[in-house]
Amino acid sequence: MARMYYDEDGNLDLLANKTVAIIGYGSQGHAHALNLKDSGIDVIVGLYPGSKSAKKAEEAGLTVHSVADAAAKADWIMILLPDEVQKSVYKQEIEPHLKEGKVLSFAHGFNIHFGQIVPPPTVDVVMVAPKGPGHLVRRTYTQGEGVPCLFAVFQDASGQARDRAMAYAKGIGGTRAGILETSFREETETDLFGEQVVLCGGLSALIKAGFQTLVDAGYQPELAYFECLHEVKLIVDLIVEGGLANMRDSISNTAEYGDYTRGPRIVTDETRAEMRKILQEIQSGQFAREFVLENQSGKPGFTAMRRQEAEHPIEEVGKDLRAMFSWLKKA
């Protein structure tokens, strides 16, 4: 059974008199920076010249530097940039300033695990990964709560890397909810698998297939949207609150019976075989190489897929329906 660690397990004194540079000020960046600041940590932000986020960070009371200057000034560097740009920013702006004793950290293990970034042996390399979007990390912190985090050590040059990672997790509010120890490999591979097979890829494909099946059978697209997309959140909320059993306890007997008898016909042995194949592609580095090459070539396929998906009929139906939801307008 995995062990969870809480506030009493983290020691913020390990970050006392240290300067933490948050590289990037997007969803996670703003949450990490503000939470650490409110925890009494000295925080600076590193952004590229002309970044639109600089004004937001400064208005929040943070000092903004170039990425290179922030990396030079900091004892702890947290890279919170998109995976595909981290390597170039690291090589050009951060690596030259990685002096012995510093900490290099990430919120996702992709670039370390797949060898895109290779740090010098004289620095600690850790990961602190909140299991929620940045706005939730920030909001729960201000409410005296937190979002659970994963933490991991890739390289322990100081002998304190693990304790330092736990201290950082406490600084952003993670230990209020609980933090779980993992490895860069485990976090990276399970995260990619979850995104591709269940949370993003699998769910999106399932929603579209269900929607299209109903529309092709002559049902109103609006009804198909409600049944196959809109109500997903209602079911997922029940699952998050108490697992599959809680969801099944909350739905009708008709729905529950259909769940047991028809659901397994959707996820077949062939589906599970594809899941294993996708996992192997992740484990072997095939997906990582594909993603890196796609970005190096200017994202032609990625851009085309984005455009094609944005034009799917479900998007137009959803846009029109949501415009009529009075409760959504108020929210």
Swiss-Prot record:
Keywords in alphabetical order: Amino-acid biosynthesis, Branched-chain amino acid biosynthesis, Magnesium, Metal-binding, NADP, Oxidoreductase
Gene3D superfamilies: 6.10.240.10, NAD(P)-binding Rossmann-like Domain (3.40.50.720)
Pathway: Amino-acid biosynthesis; L-isoleucine biosynthesis; L-isoleucine from 2-oxobutanoate: step 2/4; Amino-acid biosynthesis; L-valine biosynthesis; L-valine from pyruvate: step 2/4
EC id: 1.1.1.86
Record-annotated KARI N-terminal Rossmann domain positions: 2-182
Cofactor comment text: Binds 2 magnesium ions per subunit.
Known catalytic reactions: (2R)-2,3-dihydroxy-3-methylbutanoate + NADP(+) = (2S)-2-acetolactate + NADPH + H(+); (2R,3R)-2,3-dihydroxy-3-methylpentanoate + NADP(+) = (S)-2-ethyl-2-hydroxy-3-oxobutanoate + NADPH + H(+)
UniProt record, GO biological process: isoleucine biosynthetic process; L-valine biosynthetic process
Function: Involved in the biosynthesis of branched-chain amino acids (BCAA). Catalyzes an alkyl-migration followed by a ketol-acid reduction of (S)-2-acetolactate (S2AL) to yield (R)-2,3-dihydroxy-isovalerate. In the isomerase reaction, S2AL is rearranged via a Mg-dependent methyl migration to produce 3-hydroxy-3-methyl-2-ketobutyrate (HMKB). In the reductase reaction, this 2-ketoacid undergoes a metal-dependent reduction by NADPH to yield (R)-2,3-dihydroxy-isovalerate.
Protein name: Ketol-acid reductoisomerase (NADP(+))
Organism: Gloeothece citriformis (strain PCC 7424) (Cyanothece sp. (strain PCC 7424))
